[in-house]
């Protein structure tokens, strides 16, 4: 496929050259934007496109006369039909670069697979999503939000990191850190509940991750044991950022009804504007579940559970310390304006007496020995994954990336619902 534009007319003037040079300088300063976005800018710049070398790079063709005998001429080609950049803008990330070994998770839109990079021999968790399923449920904004949030999380030890994202004609791929210590949900199911020191350790690491997200004006909105992983040493790793809301400042609110029923805050159920304190409510619900084995207002009947969340007083059994009781009462405060964290956000949680034994600097640097070690022998140790997933065959279509459908580097993204999805980290040797 090629870009169709007007043939170069007249000599390349100084002003035209300046236009092309300006684009190149901008690219060098903003390499994180990705090659496909850069190519799109060049393709849209009339001065640059008239330069012979640029035409050669883009494979720009000269305009052709329409077929005289065609009574029903085709409409002008869309951007998806105009530029061919080859198989990938990022040679380090396309489906055929990976051996897909096992299914390790499933969701509404696709699967998570253990994969080994053929060249690097590194192991990754690759989240593969079906575009049709996403578009059918009109969830493309959430997928792009997840991608955007992942790009901001790479420097925090308790948030899963994104290495690459790319797409084919029918699928989206997130190449993520491979975490194989199991979901917190999995361990809670096996042990029913945790002793208070273990619950405190996990709650502290979770709070640290949430506080970091809040510092970026991101509200997580979907904290639950299924989204909390343990790494091979036993530290928590927060994953699945599809429901995150960006650009929520300290006093900012949003109103989208979303989350998981057991962990919804009262203001969300009331369909009132809510703020980042919804995350502290969820932290309280998860801590309660770690200590007692079930979420605080749980009922098999969803309507009854919602009524409990809205109206039932919090009931705490006597087998926890006073500091744990006080923390749960503060986090599970139904009035968000009185909830722990409403004034000073993470600092209120950090300074609570329940966490007085936590050295937060040591925590963030992973100098505190986790209370539980998953004892995994290596990347191929899948003991902490549900056999329901790992025994499922890997779909053969997952690893296919024929050049005819791979669009990672194509400016076809400009005409698609997933504009800018593809990502590769900057490389010093790129230019």
Curated annotation (Swiss-Prot):
Domain named Protein kinase: residues: 98-355
Ranges of residues in domain AGC-kinase C-terminal: 356-431
Stretches for region Disordered: 66-92
Matching InterPro entries: AGC-kinase_C (IPR000961), Kinase-like_dom_sf (IPR011009), Pkinase_C (IPR017892), Prot_kinase_dom (IPR000719), Protein_kinase_ATP_BS (IPR017441), Ser/Thr_kinase_AS (IPR008271)
Keyword annotations from UniProtKB, A to Z: Apoptosis, ATP-binding, Cell membrane, Cytoplasm, Disulfide bond, Endoplasmic reticulum, Kinase, Membrane, Mitochondrion, Nucleotide-binding, Nucleus, Phosphoprotein, Serine/threonine-protein kinase, Stress response, Transferase, Ubl conjugation
Intervals of motif Nuclear localization signal: 131-141
Presence of keyword Cell cycle: no
Residue numbers of Phosphoserine PTMs: 74, 78, 397, 401, 422
EC code(s) of this entry: 2.7.11.1
Compositional bias annotation for Polar residues: 81-91
Gene Ontology cellular component terms for the protein in this record: endoplasmic reticulum membrane; mitochondrion; nucleus; plasma membrane
Protein purpose: Serine/threonine-protein kinase which is involved in the regulation of a wide variety of ion channels, membrane transporters, cellular enzymes, transcription factors, neuronal excitability, cell growth, proliferation, survival, migration and apoptosis. Plays an important role in cellular stress response.
Protein name: Serine/threonine-protein kinase Sgk1
């Amino acid at each position: 496929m090629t870009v169709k534009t007007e043939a170069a007319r007249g000599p390349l003037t100084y002003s035209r050259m300046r236009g092309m040079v300006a684009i190149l300088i901008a690219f060098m300063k903003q390499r994180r934007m990705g090659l496909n976005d850069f190519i799109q800018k060049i393709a849209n710049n009339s001065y640059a496109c008239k330069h012979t070398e640029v035409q050669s790079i883009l494979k720009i063709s000269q305009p052709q006369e329409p077929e005289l005998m065609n009574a029903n001429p085709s409409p002008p080609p869309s951007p998806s039909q105009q530029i061919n950049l080859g198989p990938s803008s990022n040679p380090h990330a396309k489906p055929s670069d990976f051996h897909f070994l096992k299914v390790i998770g499933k969701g509404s839109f696709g699967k998570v697979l253990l994969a080994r990079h053929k060249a690097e021999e590194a192991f990754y968790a690759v989240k593969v999503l079906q575009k049709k399923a996403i578009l059918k449920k009109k969830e493309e904004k959430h997928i792009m939000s997840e991608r955007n949030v992942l790009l901001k999380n790479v420097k925090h030890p308790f948030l899963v990191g994104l290495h690459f994202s790319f797409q084919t004609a029918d699928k989206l791929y997130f190449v993520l850190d491979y975490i194989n210590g199991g979901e917190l949900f999995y361990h809670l199911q096996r042990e029913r509940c945790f002793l208070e020191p273990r619950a405190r350790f996990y709650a502290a690491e979770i709070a640290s991750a949430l506080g970091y997200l809040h510092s970026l004006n991101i509200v997580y909105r979907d904290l639950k044991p299924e989204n909390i992983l343990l790494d091979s040493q036993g530290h928590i790793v927060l994953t699945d950022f599809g429901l995150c809301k960006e650009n929520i400042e300290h006093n900012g609110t949003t109103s989208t009804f979303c989350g998981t029923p057991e962990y919804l805050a009262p203001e969300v159920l009331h369909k009132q504007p809510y703020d980042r304190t919804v995350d502290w409510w969820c932290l309280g619900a998860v801590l309660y579940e770690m200590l007692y084995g079930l979420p605080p207002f749980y009922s098999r009947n969803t309507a009854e559970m919602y009524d409990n969340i809205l109206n039932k007083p919090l009931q705490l059994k006597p087998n926890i310390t006073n500091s744990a009781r006080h923390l749960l009462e503060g986090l599970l405060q139904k009035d968000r304006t009185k909830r722990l964290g409403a004034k000073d956000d993470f600092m209120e949680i950090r300074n609570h007496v329940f966490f007085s034994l936590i050295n937060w600097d040591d925590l963030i640097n992973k100098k505190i020995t986790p209370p539980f070690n998953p004892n995994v022998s290596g990347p191929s140790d899948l003991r902490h994954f549900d056999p329901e997933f790992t025994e499922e065959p890997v779909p053969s279509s997952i690893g296919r990336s024929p050049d005819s459908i791979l669009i990672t580097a194509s400016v076809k993204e400009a005409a698609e619902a997933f504009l800018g999805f593809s990502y590769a980290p900057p490389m010093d040797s790129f230019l």
